[in-house]
Amino acid sequence: MKAAVKFESVLKDHLADAEQAAKYLTACYEEGPEVFLQGLRDVVEAQGGMSRAARLAGLNRESLYRQLSRRGNPSLASLNAVLTALRLKLR
């Protein structure tokens, strides 16, 4: 019998690739703000974690956690900083 593979593990491996991450975020964006923020959290985790993203984006780690939380309301500047740090762009 084949061993089960966790979905989260497969997703994380998939999202480590910038091109795949961009496609994933585009699909998430089309579903609405809550889904987009969850997608962005997924990509951040897959590409090194929140601490790394905050450092590269020039943002405070705790603040970034709050902004990207389920109740978060990140500014456009923060979103742009994170996306730029991940080498992604809004179109």
Please place each PLM-identified region on the residue numbering:
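Generic, well-ordered alpha-helical segments
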Residues: 28, 32-36, 45-46, 56, ...
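N-terminal flexible/basic segments that precede or flank functional cores
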Residues: 1-39
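DNA major-groove recognition helix of helix-turn-helix/homeodomain DNA-binding modules
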Residues: 75-91
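Residue-level detection of the helix-turn-helix DNA-binding "recognition helix"
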Residues: 69-70
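Short alpha-helical DNA-recognition segment
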Residues: 46-66
